[in-house]
Amino acid sequence: MFKKNDRSQSRERRHMRVRKKIFGTAERPRLSVYRSEKHIYAQLIDDVEGKTLVAASSSEKGFDGVGSNKEGAKLVGKMIAEKALEKGLKKVVFDRGGFIYHGRIKELAEGAREAGLDF
């Protein structure tokens, strides 16, 4: 019997393939992105120490937008970039989390680039 793969399993498999190649350091942390139905989350991770350096999401108190659309994702990208620049982090490695580089993921990346992050 053939078994149909669901989207979440396929995304997890893609994410594992991407994570084999992408590694964040303290000088150039990994910008990890997660997308749910209602919100979008981003964090800068130092994989050497295993610590989150900066995080931003559409579920934060200061967020004035909708996390389930592209405009909200762009705002989260700008928020993460501003927090990173405050900590002196300019260069990052982008980890799309197994999601296709399209829609909200792409807007978050473009918002972070516009606000000053380099990747």
From Swiss-Prot:
<dbReference type="GO" id="GO:0022625">
    <property type="term" value="C:cytosolic large ribosomal subunit"/>
</dbReference>
<comment type="subunit">
    <text>Part of the 50S ribosomal subunit; part of the 5S rRNA/L5/L18/L25 subcomplex. Contacts the 5S and 23S rRNAs.</text>
</comment>
<protein>
    <recommendedName>
        <fullName>Large ribosomal subunit protein uL18</fullName>
    </recommendedName>
</protein>
<dbReference type="GO" id="GO:0006412">
    <property type="term" value="P:translation"/>
</dbReference>
<dbReference type="GO" id="GO:0008097">
    <property type="term" value="F:5S rRNA binding"/>
</dbReference>
<comment type="similarity">
    <text>Belongs to the universal ribosomal protein uL18 family.</text>
</comment>
<keyword id="KW-0699">rRNA-binding</keyword>
<keyword id="KW-0694">RNA-binding</keyword>
<comment type="function">
    <text>This is one of the proteins that bind and probably mediate the attachment of the 5S RNA into the large ribosomal subunit, where it forms part of the central protuberance.</text>
</comment>
<dbReference type="InterPro" id="IPR004389">
    <property type="entry name" value="Ribosomal_uL18_bac-type"/>
</dbReference>
<dbReference type="Pfam" id="PF00861">
    <property type="entry name" value="Ribosomal_L18p"/>
</dbReference>
<dbReference type="InterPro" id="IPR005484">
    <property type="entry name" value="Ribosomal_uL18_bac/euk"/>
</dbReference>
<dbReference type="GO" id="GO:0003735">
    <property type="term" value="F:structural constituent of ribosome"/>
</dbReference>
<keyword id="KW-0687">Ribonucleoprotein</keyword>
<keyword id="KW-0689">Ribosomal protein</keyword>
